[in-house]
From Swiss-Prot:
Enzyme Commission code(s) on record: 5.3.1.12
Native source organism of the sequence: Salmonella newport (strain SL254)
Keyword presence, Isomerase: yes
Pathway per the UniProt entry: Carbohydrate metabolism; pentose and glucuronate interconversion
GO-annotated molecular function: glucuronate isomerase activity
GO biological process: D-galacturonate catabolic process; D-glucuronate catabolic process
Enzyme kind, highest EC tier: isomerase
Name of the protein this chain belongs to: Uronate isomerase
Superkingdom assignment: Bacteria
Amino acid sequence: MATFMTEDFLLKNDIARTLYHKYAAPMPIYDFHCHLSPQEIADDRRFDNLGQIWLEGDHYKWRALRSAGVDESLITGKETSDYEKYMAWANTVPKTLGNPLYHWTHLELRRPFGITGTLFGPDTAESIWTQCNEKLATPAFSARGIMQQMNVRMVGTTDDPIDSLEYHRQIAADDSIDIEVAPSWRPDKVFKIELDGFVDYLGKLEAAADVSITRFDDLRQALTRRLDHFAACGCRASDHGIETLRFAPVPDDAQLDAILGKRLAGETLSELEIAQFTTAVLVWLGRQYAARGWVMQLHIGAIRNNNTRMFRLLGPDTGFDSIGDNNISWALSRLLDSMDVTNELPKTILYCLNPRDNEVLATMIGNFQGPGIAGKVQFGSGWWFNDQKDGMLRQLEQLSQMGLLSQFVGMLTDSRSFLSYTRHEYFRRILCNLLGQWAQDGEIPDDEAMLSRMVQDICFNNAQRYFTIK
C-alpha cells in the first residue's frame, strides 16, 4: 500500500520520478495569470497568522466549508477571528477526501512551511498553527519571501483598464525585487454593454483616459490611451471573462454609435445589438493586441453570482459561481476568424470551464496557427473547477491527441493566494506521471533527453518565450 504524499506523490514509475525530480521540480515558475494583489507584493505584506494567509479570499475553501455545513460567520464573517475560521477549516479538511483541496492543503503545508508526515485536522491544528505562525513572523514568509522560496520568476496580475498601475510601477522601480510583476489588461466592463453598471463604468473610463465618450470612436480613443499606459507599465497580456460568447458581424460606426447612444440614454438593447457591440469591441481590441505583440486570453463559460441572496450579502467572487453549458464553437470560430481574416489575430489562449468543450478548443486552435510562432493559439490549462487531477489529465491528453502538447505554455495559478504556487507542483507531477506512463507502456520513446526537454519546456520555457514581445 502506498503512503500518502511522499516525495514521489503521484509519480507511479521510475521514468516519471526522474522527469519530475531531475527536470520539472527545479524549473522556475512563470505564473502568467493570477489574481494576486500588486499592492501586497509592492508592500511585501506580512501575514499575521496561518488562518489569514490560508483562508482570506480563497473561495475554493469557502465552498467546501459551506458544503460541510459551517456557519457563514466562520467563513467570511467579520465578527469571527482568524483562529476561529482556521479551526473551522481544520474540522472540515478530513471531510474533503477525494477533493483536490485535500491534496492542496497538504502540499501547501509541505511548501513553504516544511510540514510533512502529519495529516491536517482538528487533532493537529494547534501544533500546525504554532509552527506556521512562527515562520510567518520571519522575513522569509512575507509575500515576496514566499514567492522567492517557491522560485517564482514572473507573475501576471489581473487589472482593469482604469487602474493606475501605481504598484506595478513601484515594483519595477525597486531594484531589490527580482520577480517580474506585469499587469494584464482585463476589459470585461468595457465590452459587456448589457451589464447594469456599464454607463457608470464608462464615466470612470472617461476620467482615466481624459476622453469624453459619446461615440464608438471616442471609446476607441479612450481605450488606446489606456492600452498605451498598460504597455508603458510592462503589460503583454490581456484577459477576458466571457460568460456568454456572442458573435455578430461588426456593423459600421454609425450603427455602433446608435447602439452606444441607446445604452447611454438608458434604453434596452436587443440581443443582436449586444452581440454587435461586444463583437466590435473584442475584434478591435484583438487587433490592438496583435499590433503590440500581446497575448489574448479568453476564459469562457462560467455562470457567475448564481445565489442572489449571497451576492447581495457578500458581492462577487465569493464562491457562488459554476459551470455554464452554452454552445461556443460557432461564435468562437467566427470571432477568431474576424481577426485572422486581416492577419490581425494575436497570440491567443483559450480556456473553457465546461470540460465537454475541451475537444472544441483542442481542435479550434488548429484552425488559426501561424508561421513563426510555435503554438500561436493555445488550449489553456484546466481552469477553475478543472484544475484538479482529472481535469488536468483530460486537458493534457486531449491537447496531445489533437494538437502539440510539446508547445503547451503550461500551468497558471489563477489564484488570490500566495500559497497557491503548489498548484504548479501538482501540475508538474501529473504531467511527468503521464509522460512516464506513456513511456513505460511503449507509447512514446523512453528517451530521457527528449522527454526532459519537453517537460522543461511545458513547465517554464514555452511560457517565457510565448509572453516575450519581439
